[in-house]
Amino acid sequence: SNCMKKSNLFFIIIFSCITVVAQSKDELAVRAVLETQRQAWNAGNIDQFMDGYWQSDSLMFIGAKRVTYGWTNTLNNYKNSYSDTAAMGKLDFDIQEAKKLSEMYFFVVGKWRLTLSKGNDSGFFSLLFKKIKNKWVIVVDHTP
């Protein structure tokens, strides 16, 4: 019947809207992790910056020369590479792609920029976020 068709269409529209709202809520949560990281970095706080990463030995960081496994190893690499706030500079992100892959995974591609006293640096990154204990964290970071 015509009434049934309208009713079905109504539910399709409602469920579509719910999906979009849920996706944007997750995307906002993922972007908030990156913004918190940016602020921590710019405050010279690598420990707080690392809160955005999965605290696990299975965390994967893919750099230009090697793959590093583990949260602690990644933290130590950051601390060795950026010994002080002058070396850290000021970080900025330009998110180019943010895609929800499933209820548990989110994929982000962006450009990072470091403003340093000795000259600026920039590059691209891709991040795989996973929702663990109701919190989005980076489980794979590819920053060559």
Q: In which residue ranges do the predicted regions lie?
A:
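Bacterial Sec-dependent N-terminal signal peptides
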Residues: 1-26
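Short, low-complexity N-terminal intrinsically disordered segments enriched in polar/charged residues
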Residues: 17-52
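Hydrophobic pocket/interface hotspot
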Residues: 37, 49-50, 58-59, 74, ...
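A mature extracytoplasmic/lumenal domain signature
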Residues: 54, 65, 97, 110-112, ...
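Structural motif
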Residues: 55, 101-102, 132
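A short gly/proline-enriched turn/hairpin at secondary-structure junctions
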Residues: 58-69, 83-86
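Surface-exposed, charged secondary-structure patches
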Residues: 73-117
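Short beta-strand edge/turn micro-motifs at domain boundaries
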Residues: 122-144
